[in-house]
Design a protein with these regions (language model features):
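C-terminal regulatory domains involved in ligand/effector binding and gene-expression control
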Residues: 14-112, 117-237
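N-terminal amphipathic/basic-hydrophobic helices that include classical n-h-c signal peptides
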Residues: 1-21
């Protein structure tokens, strides 16, 4: 179960459903890159993060696609699969998967505008957490841009349920998270986390959270062509 309280404003939303906030947009000071193995495909990939213009948002670019159609705007509307990884794609059928840790790092560092270049269909898994991506962003440096950040306006509670899983958004004058997981496995069992992500708490308290899985699922996943790049240095088993 998860509860997220999002920024709430009465100034009125624009056509995109977002409102201006007191904070300015941010991007990177300079390009930065890394390489690593992709969790599910098992291939070696290179990734770069590039500064982007105000209002351009987050954009993925497949550098291994020679013709047009290599750009994928990062948006919930472009999610094509969320089975064991988040995959987004465009109308040309070009996709990039396992983007969730990088997205968490960009959100946690309050980066609004960036171009993400990758030379394959999946981002590198690194150590299985968002922390290496936070380090990458800090290496690049963060610059404030001359335009207000725009945020989704939550006016009433919203809840999504899928079996025993649920996520709720609740109007608030602040921004906070409350998470709860409950597994039969005693090594994980029931855990809770409530946090207000300000003043570096994302980096210190959230970014190091790592992907975990169960040993009994590994053979089944690999038979299905998944977790081919999984290892004990990029996942907890």
């Amino acid at each position: 179960f998860g509860v997220i309280e999002l920024y709430h404003d009465e100034t009125g939303a624009g056509p995109d459903g977002r409102v201006s906030t007191p904070m300015n947009q941010k991007s990177l000071r300079k390009p930065v890159g890394c390489s690593g193995i992709a969790l599910h495909s098992g291939i070696d990939v290179e990734m770069k993060l590039l500064p982007a213009e105000t209002g351009s948002g987050l954009t993925l670019r497949r550098t291994d696609i020679a013709n047009g159609g290599s750009l994928i705007p990062v948006s919930w509307e472009n999610v094509v699969s969320s089975y064991l990884a988040t995959t987004i794609g465009n109308k040309h059928g070009v996709t990039v998967s396992t983007i969730e840790h990088l997205m968490a790092a960009l959100a946690g560092c309050e980066i609004d505008n960036v171009v993400i270049e990758v030379d394959g269909p999946e981002l590198p898994i690194m150590d299985g957490s968002a922390a290496p991506f936070v380090d990458l962003i800090e290496q690049a440096g963060i610059v404030e841009q001359d335009a207000p950040r725009r945020a989704i306006q939550i006016l009433k509670p919203v809840k999504v349920e899928d079996g025993e899983r649920s996520l709720a958004l609740i109007p608030s004058d602040g921004f906070s998270f409350s998470f709860e997981i409950d597994f039969e496995t005693s090594s994980i069992a029931r855990q809770e986390l409530a946090i207000v992500p300000v003043n570096g708490t994302f980096k210190s308290d959230i970014a190091n959270a790592r992907t975990f899985g169960f040993a009994e699922d590994v053979d089944r996943m690999r038979a299905a062509g998944l977790a081919l790049g999984g290892a004990l240095d990029n996942a907890i088993v």
